[in-house]
Amino acid sequence: MVPKSFASKCWLIARAAAALGLAFGLLALTNPPRALAANDRFRATIPDGGAGESDLLRTPLQFEQAASGHPQSATQSLFSRCRRPPFSGTVSLYSPITAPVFDAIVNDTAFGFADGSSCYNPQNEQNIVINPANAQNVVTSSNEYRDNVHAVYYSRDGGQTWNNVFLPGWTRSSGGAGTFSHLDSCGDPVLAFSPDGQRLYYSGLVCNFDKFPRTLSGVAVAVSTNGGASWSAPTMVDYRASGDFFNDKEWVTAGPGNTVYLTWTKFYQGPRGLGYLRSPIVMASSSDGGKTWSSVKAVSDAAHPFNQGSQVAVAPDGALYVAYEGSDPATGYATDQLVVARSTNGGTSFLNSQVARVWDDLDCYPLQLPGAQGRQTLTNEQFRINSFPSMSIDPTTGGIAIVWADDQGAGNCGSGSATFSGVSSNQVKLVRSADGVHWTAPRTITAGAADKVYASVGAHAGRVVIGYYTRAYSPAPTATDRSCGIAELDSTTGNVVLPTDAGRANAAVCLDWAVRSSSDNFATEKRVTTQSSNPYITFAGSFIGDYTGTAVGADGKAVTVWTDFRGNPGLTPANQDALVGTGF
């Protein structure tokens, strides 16, 4: 049963959305009865609404056209500036990207508008892996908005040059057969190498929103035996056509031999697909390299019915770990916890333990402005955020590192209020364990008032590296340079104007990417990006992906990947691209 506070919040948001007539598509979750019913106090327990997840609008072009045709008032509509001066045309605000940072996207494509302007297709939400048998073979992935496909990007020179591969057979547009012939890409791409480096697994979501409200969704896996250059057709791991549940946020890992594990969140939406009853973390496994899969098993326990954002990994001793964000039964599900599920019998059973408080309450963040999803965001930003964990297990020592970002200590966070008051100051937290049973106390590894979000972690050869976005380097906008400021659409004139609120008009909103490592006990922040870039560039600033990636190779060197908003200066105008930093 959904707690009363959840239901009350659902009703209020649904009523407000109906009054505004919001139908923004792709990243606005245009299933108001379904998605908004899940938009309760615990914002981790919301279907992600990522790539392609929409009834009506599946592409950035459709999103832009809907926004321009149905603008909100100037103080509410945050408009994508990939087609607005000074972000339009071929002139870039940014200098070329240089080593040790490289653009993983090759031959990006653009889509045009009736007025002659255009935008380049975005890529966001990345995962990255290093071949354990060949540190030069680096592979990453992202939500790919070129032609409704699943895609990976592989390198054979340590991340300096890249090849882009569209995976065959996942969707109707990529030659899908059988069930896949009427499905679309729903994002959440994840990669995992087998311990010997011989097999590379890719997992992702597929769905069909044409059947709303009984939305169809599935999770599938494909395999590469040549480091990502070519791929098998996908195998469906879990799919039902009832629409009574929605699969979301899957994660894949590989164990010794041909063992593969896949976890995800299963949102139970009721017999008509319009509610939100619970969201357990579940798992399926394969013992033949992903050809066949077991039945679905529970990972989270009955005490934790509302969960999201799982990551699964195998320790050197064969123990299986699943980290996720779950609501805390001790507080009536009013607060959140980092939960770690441990299995020593190959996933037959799990022991779930609450490891750390996660400060992700209803009163810990402002909400997105109307026109987006009503999700948590940062002060003066518009992209949705979360506190899902990122986990890595060192294959040489068995040490486990888990990171996340939350807003502890900011404003009235944790006061029990229904709304946030103050200024966000998100920070990255770290917990570690040598045995999977005993855990360190949460440690805040970042400092300063500027927000840090979407942390990811990699561990190998005794070294831990953590990457994250930071607002610490963003210049403030000026009268002559708005590149790191907010622009809004005047619904009367159609012009882009400054916010009327002085605080928003002067807000510095650009992001950078930074890393810290255990080499100096995480004391030093290394700025990876050479220029700050503006996240409002695509999707009206409402979506930059729900996770990032960091990995450490056997040589102790790290690669890290994030959504950057510069595009590829000199080749494309500003847009969302997957950039990879190497050699850290």
Question: What name fits each language-model region?
Answer:
Residues 1-12:
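N-terminal secretory signal peptides that target proteins for export/translocation
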Residues 8, 30-31, 134:
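Polar helix-capping/helix-linker motif
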Residues 15-28:
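Bacterial N-terminal signal peptides
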Residues 28-42:
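Signal peptide processing junction and immediate N-terminal pro/mature segment
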